[in-house]
């Protein structure tokens, strides 16, 4: 049946488009994360700074969960689905940034996360930041 073949092809195209958008969102989040930190992530990872790598990985997992939620659900139309994806991705960027700032202010008031990650290479702080942003993204995914 021709309509069934068209339906399958249309579903495959939608999947490929939203997969690509998810990758773009993750790439943009890495750039956003770099812009909002006080150090160069690439340089620190090249210097074998595991703490920075763990913090980045935790943030990417958190953003990956947000992107999952952004692409999840019933496809209504291109316009509505793309608008929903973009809205949810931007909300994820903002939420994760705010959560990272709150970790600095509330959980580690006597020091800065960036100092602990870069100067002290404190992997414990990297785990704290990762756990908090992943938890916040899970709340966002399941609450909305």
Regions found by a protein language model. Name each.
Residues 20-37, 94-109:
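Membrane-water interface of transmembrane alpha-helices
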Residues 73-78, 101-114:
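Membrane-proximal helix-loop-helix units in multi-pass membrane proteins
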Residues 112-131:
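Interfacial loop-to-transmembrane junctions
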Residues 38-54:
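Alpha-helical transmembrane segments with an aromatic anchor "belt"
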Residues 6-25, 80-96:
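Alpha-helical transmembrane segments
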Residues 52-71:
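A generic, lipid-embedded transmembrane alpha helix
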Residues 18, 128-135:
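Hydrophobic alpha-helical transmembrane segments of membrane proteins
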Residues 1-9, 34-41, 65-80, 139-144:
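Transmembrane helix-loop junctions in multi-pass membrane proteins
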């Amino acid at each position: 049946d021709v309509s069934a073949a068209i339906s399958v092809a249309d579903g495959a195209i939608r999947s490929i488009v939203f997969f690509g958008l998810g990758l773009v969102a993750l790439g943009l989040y890495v750039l956003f994360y770099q812009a909002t930190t006080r150090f160069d992530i690439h340089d620190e990872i090249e210097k074998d700074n595991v703490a920075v790598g763990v913090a980045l990985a935790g943030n990417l997992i958190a953003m990956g969960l947000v992107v999952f939620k952004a692409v999840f659900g019933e496809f209504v139309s291109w316009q509505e689905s793309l608008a929903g994806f973009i809205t949810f991705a931007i909300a994820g960027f903002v939420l994760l940034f705010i959560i990272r700032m709150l970790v600095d202010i509330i959980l580690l008031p006597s020091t800065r996360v960036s100092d602990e990650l870069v100067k002290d290479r404190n992997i414990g702080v990297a785990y704290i930041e990762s756990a908090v942003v992943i938890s916040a993204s899970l709340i966002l995914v399941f609450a909305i």
